[in-house]
C-alpha cells in the first residue's frame, strides 16, 4: 500500500491564496512552481511523516502536529499530522505567522 496525503479544506484554501499571491506578485510561473513544490513536499511527507519538527504548543490535543518547509519557498510552512496511511495536510502558512496564535484562533481542521 502506498503512502497518501490528504489536503484538508483550510490547507486547500491556504494553497489557493498563496498560489494567487505568488502569481500576482511575480508572475504565473512562480505561482505554478509554488504549487508544484508544495505538492512535492506533501508526497515526501506522506512517505516520511517524521521528517518535520514539533512546534512548541501547549495544547495537548495538538501533540501530533508537525511542521515542514516547502523546498524553494523556505518561508512557507506545511502544518500536518501523521495518519495511519500517510499524512493529513492541515495548513500551509508563511513562516512569519505565529503558529500558536493561528492554531488557537483559526484551528487546523
Model-derived regions, located:
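Arg/Lys-rich, positively charged N-terminal/basic patches that mediate binding to nucleic acids
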Residues: 1-37, 109
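Hydrophobic pocket/interface hotspot
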Residues: 11, 38, 45, 89
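Residue-level signal for well-ordered alpha-helical positions
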Residues: 18, 48, 102-105
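Generic structural signal for secondary-structure transition and capping sites
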Residues: 20, 27, 43, 47-51, ...
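Short, hydrophobic secondary-structure boundary micro-motifs
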Residues: 31, 53-57, 101
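Hydrophobic alpha-helical segments of small multi-pass membrane proteins
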Residues: 36-40, 66-68
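Basic/aromatic recognition patch in beta-strand/loop cores that engages polyanionic ligands
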Residues: 47-85
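Enriched for short, Lys/Arg-rich terminal
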Residues: 70-109
